[in-house]
Amino acid sequence: MRQILFAAGIALAVSILLTPVLIKAFSRQGFGQEIRVEGPASHQSKRGTPTMGGVAILAGLWAGYWGSHLIGIGYDADGPSASGLLVLGLTTALGGVGFLDDFIKIRKQRNLGLNKTAKLVGQLIAAVAFGILALQFRGANDLTPGSEHLSYVRDIATVTMGSVVFVAFCYLLVSAWSNAVNLTDGLDGLAAGSMSLVLGAYVIITFWQYRNACETSPGKGCYDVRDPLDLALICAAGAGACIGFLWWNAAPAKIFMGDTGSLALGGMLAGLSITTRTELLMVVIGALFVAEAASVVIQVAVFRSSRRRVFRMAPFHHHFELAGWAETTVIIRFWLLAAIASAIGLALFYSEYLAAIGG
């Protein structure tokens, strides 16, 4: 538990202290956000706000994770694990793709960075590497970081994918979650605040898996998850980094996370869902991100078939803005929805555990 607190605290401190440094540096360099012309008129005043703040989130994540392990040496805590390093690597790789996207936007002074093909290729390389490596590194109980079984709260024994399909599934999750968080990052603090809630829920899940791991506590309801405590450190560091960044990103935002942050955080969700064996549960806990992405899919599909729009604008947080809601009202209510989804997900997780032990 101490390591988890250290990870969150260090990440928060690094993120909250580094972000204003980045604001000044990026402002000096002219690294400002371009705004969609067709977006809400109120957003035009945000043009030029520094972007690529995801650098601070990634720095906080790395500092929190490695700092907690360095402190852990003092009381013989376990070192870094395959699962933790894989999720950290996937998060960083997606952050790198986002950084390139942001940098091109800034240099070309437009709201479009990497083209769709280049972005998909970047996601593909990161996801395939993660998927292949996730089936290696067998540890205690012959567990690997990933599993060829589809999972809800634990592996579903009757649904086996095979290694090739598993790697393809990893790409689907990485692409879906990174794009979902990217689409949600359209209002000040919306993505950072929502991610803090989701990662907070996953701190609880991973710590519970650690306390009830089949390796150390075999019996009814135990979890076959490799390195759950190390995954808890990743979640705690990620949550702390998001909260520290949110201090400066809350409305009115002094800096945006950009694709550097949103793609990285989406990659983290994908990696965590795979390594914690909660691929389907993540859909519930991350329901806000799912809804934002679904609103875009629905809008495009309906418009192409009927030339009509379901929403005034997609992602649908803009729909409510155009309906007259103040931006801060949309943000706070969406945070509440994210909190409710996280609470429902935790309830489902615990109820499955009670059912497993016969409670």
Curated annotation (Swiss-Prot):
This is Phospho-N-acetylmuramoyl-pentapeptide-transferase. Belongs to the glycosyltransferase 4 family. MraY subfamily. Its cofactor is Mg(2+). Keywords: Cell cycle, Cell division, Cell membrane, Cell shape, Cell wall biogenesis/degradation, Magnesium, Membrane, Metal-binding, Peptidoglycan synthesis, Transferase, Transmembrane, Transmembrane helix. It catalyses: UDP-N-acetyl-alpha-D-muramoyl-L-alanyl-gamma-D-glutamyl-meso-2,6-diaminopimeloyl-D-alanyl-D-alanine + di-trans,octa-cis-undecaprenyl phosphate = di-trans,octa-cis-undecaprenyl diphospho-N-acetyl-alpha-D-muramoyl-L-alanyl-D-glutamyl-meso-2,6-diaminopimeloyl-D-alanyl-D-alanine + UMP. Its EC number is 2.7.8.13. GO terms for biological process: cell division; cell wall organization; peptidoglycan biosynthetic process; regulation of cell shape. CDD domains: GT_MraY. Catalyzes the initial step of the lipid cycle reactions in the biosynthesis of the cell wall peptidoglycan: transfers peptidoglycan precursor phospho-MurNAc-pentapeptide from UDP-MurNAc-pentapeptide onto the lipid carrier undecaprenyl phosphate, yielding undecaprenyl-pyrophosphoryl-MurNAc-pentapeptide, known as lipid I. Pathway: Cell wall biogenesis; peptidoglycan biosynthesis. One of its GO terms (cellular component) is plasma membrane. It is found in: Cell membrane. Pfam families: Glycos_transf_4, MraY_sig1. The gene is mraY. NCBIfam families: mraY. The chain crosses the membrane at residues 3-23, 53-73, 84-104, 117-137, 156-176, 187-207, 231-251, 255-275, 283-303, 330-350. GO terms for molecular function: metal ion binding; phospho-N-acetylmuramoyl-pentapeptide-transferase activity; UDP-N-acetylmuramoyl-L-alanyl-D-glutamyl-meso-2,6-diaminopimelyl-D-alanyl-D-alanine:undecaprenyl-phosphate transferase activity.
